[in-house]
From Swiss-Prot:
Compartments, as annotated in UniProt: Cytoplasm
Function: Component of the phosphoenolpyruvate-dependent nitrogen-metabolic phosphotransferase system (nitrogen-metabolic PTS), that seems to be involved in regulating nitrogen metabolism. The phosphoryl group from phosphoenolpyruvate (PEP) is transferred to the phosphoryl carrier protein NPr by enzyme I-Ntr. Phospho-NPr then transfers it to EIIA-Ntr. Could function in the transcriptional regulation of sigma-54 dependent operons in conjunction with the NPr (PtsO) and EIIA-Ntr (PtsN) proteins.
Main location: cytoplasm
Catalytic residues (UniProt): H17 (pros-phosphohistidine intermediate)
GO biological process: phosphoenolpyruvate-dependent sugar phosphotransferase system
Domain HPr: 3-90
Protein name (Swiss-Prot/TrEMBL): Phosphocarrier protein NPr
UniProt key word Mitochondrion: no
Annotated InterPro entries: HPr, HPr-like, HPr-like_sf, PTS_HPr_His_P_site
Length: 91
């Protein structure tokens, strides 16, 4: 099974805070794929809100998305779009 990788920069003011992490985890869970988020030396499942919060990812940080599974490409596209849309937050 091919592993896919993408990088995206967190651009919303509050970074990957609780509400944003929840949106990301819900989105990741919709796909038949295992998605891992990496920031520096830390890794977390994209489906784990607590794991995502433990990454302590702030505005301007670049994260790496690793995906494997049947829907990995679509999942990475959707997650990148969510991050680029600043998690649909006003600011």
């Amino acid at each position: 099974m091919t592993k896919l990788e993408r990088q995206v920069t967190i651009c919303n003011k509050l970074g990957l805070h609780a509400r944003a992490a929840t949106k990301l985890a819900i989105l990741a869970s919709e796909f038949d794929a295992e998605i891992t988020i990496v920031q520096g030396e830390k890794k977390a499942s994209a489906a784990s809100v607590l794991g995502l919060l433990m990454l302590e990812t702030g505005m301007g940080k670049t994260i790496t998305l690793l995906g494997k599974g049947q829907d990995a490409d679509a999942a990475l596209d959707a997650i990148c779009a969510l991050v680029d849309a600043k998690f649909d937050e006003a600011s």
